[in-house]
Curated annotation (Swiss-Prot):
GO molecular function: ketol-acid reductoisomerase activity; magnesium ion binding; NADP binding
Protein name as catalogued: Ketol-acid reductoisomerase (NADP(+))
Phylogenetic lineage: Bacteria, Bacillati, Bacillota, Bacilli, Bacillales
Pfam family, one: KARI_C
Binding, Mg(2+) 2: D190, E226, E230
Keyword Lipid metabolism: no
InterPro entries, alphabetized: 6-PGluconate_DH-like_C_sf, KARI, KARI_C, KARI_N, KARI_prok, NAD(P)-bd_dom_sf
Domain KARI C-terminal knotted intervals: 182-327
Keyword Secreted in annotation: no
GO biological process: isoleucine biosynthetic process; L-valine biosynthetic process
Residues annotated for substrate binding in this entry: S251
Length: 341
């Protein structure tokens, strides 16, 4: 079982007198920066000019170019999108890294797949909250926290792990629990979860169910409710208490259908394909394809994205959500050219 660390296992002294540069001020960036500051850590922000720069200044931070922030910092936390990190790192961060500095990530993709090769004279570790930035911030303010993973890739100072734990504590994660992992494990399991279950698997399952009902002559609106809209009700139960709590909370008819029909949908053939997906991740095949896609300016990505946004389930969903202000108020609709939004 994984080793779990809490507040009492972390020592803030490893951040005392240090300057932390948060590179990026998006979902995770703003949460890390504000939580660290509220924990007494000296934080600066590294950005390129734009709206995020203005927002960070409005939030009371000193904002610099990425290169200048990296030069001023003892700890550099890179919170940019994976595909943007290598170029920014090479051009603006790497030249300013000094012996004994710490280079930190919230996802191991670029280190694990050698898109970023750090110098030998810096600590390299990972602090990955298991929740979106707004939740990391909100729970911190409420006196709680979001669990996180930590991993050490390179320990030059002899206390990279201690610094990682101190950082995790300062963003509130050690209030909930910090699990130790490796860059390899975090990267491969995160990608697998996204592809096979949370994103790829789930969206494919929802669409297949929706299409099955529509092709059988049922109204698309009813199919949408049954296969997509009600998903939140089930996911909330799973989130609160796992599979057993969800099954306890639904009707016996639904539970019997779960037991008898679920394995017909997710069968051994599906599991075998999951193993193939995992193999593609482990061997670097997926990473290579994604890197090449970005280098080519994402032609396939953009084409698929456009096609998916025009699927009937999205057309119907936009219409139905317009009838539900309690949903619409919380959502950000994807703007699809030619579609009603």
């Amino acid at each position: 079982m994984a080793k779990v660390y809490y507040n009492g296992d972390a020592n803030e002294q490893y951040l005392q007198g240090k300057t932390v540069a948060i590179i990026g001020y998006g979902s995770q960036g703003h949460a890390h920066a504000q939580n660290l500051r509220d924990s007494g850590v000296h934080v600066i922000i590294g950005l390129r000019k734009g709206r995020s720069w203005e927002q960070a200044e409005q939030d009371g931070f000193d904002v610099y170019s990425v290169r200048e922030a990296s030069k001023k910092a003892d700890i550099v936390m890179v919170l940019l999108p994976d595909e943007k990190q290598p170029a920014v790192y090479k051009e603006e961060i790497e030249p300013e890294l000094k012996p004994g500095n710490a280079l930190v990530f919230a996802h191991g993709f670029n280190i694990h797949f050698s898109q970023i090769v750090p110098p030998e004279h810096v600590d390299v570790f990972l602090v990955a909250p298991k929740g979106p930035g707004h939740l990391v911030r909100r729970t911190y303010v409420e006196g709680a926290g979001v669990p996180a993973l930590i991993a050490v890739y390179q320990d030059v100072t002899g206390h990279a792990k201690e610094t990682a734990l101190a950082y995790a504590k300062a963003i509130g994660a050690a209030r909930a629990g910090v699990l130790e992992t490796t860059f390899k494990e975090e990267t491969e399991t995160d990608l697998f979860g996204e592809q096979a279950v949370l994103c790829g698997g789930l969206t494919a399952l929802i669409k297949a169910g929706f299409e099955t009902l529509v092709e059988a002559g049922y109204q698309p609106e009813v199919a949408y409710f049954e296969c997509l809209h009600e998903m939140k009700l089930i996911v909330d139960l799973l989130y609160e208490g796992g599979l057993s709590w969800m099954r306890y909370s639904i009707s016996d008819t639904a539970q019997w259908g779960d037991f008898t029909s679920g394995p017909r949908v997710i069968n051994e053939a599906v599991k075998a394909e999951m193993k193939n997906i995992l193999h593609d991740i482990q061997t670097g095949k997926f990473a290579k394809g994604w890197i090449l896609e970005n280098q080519a300016n994402r032609p396939e990505f953009n084409a698929i994205n456009q096609r998916e946004n025009e699927h009937l389930i999205e057309v119907v969903g936009r219409e139905l959500r317009s009838m539900m202000p309690f949903v619409k108020a919380k959502q950000k609709e994807v703007v699809v050219p030619g579609a009603k939004n």
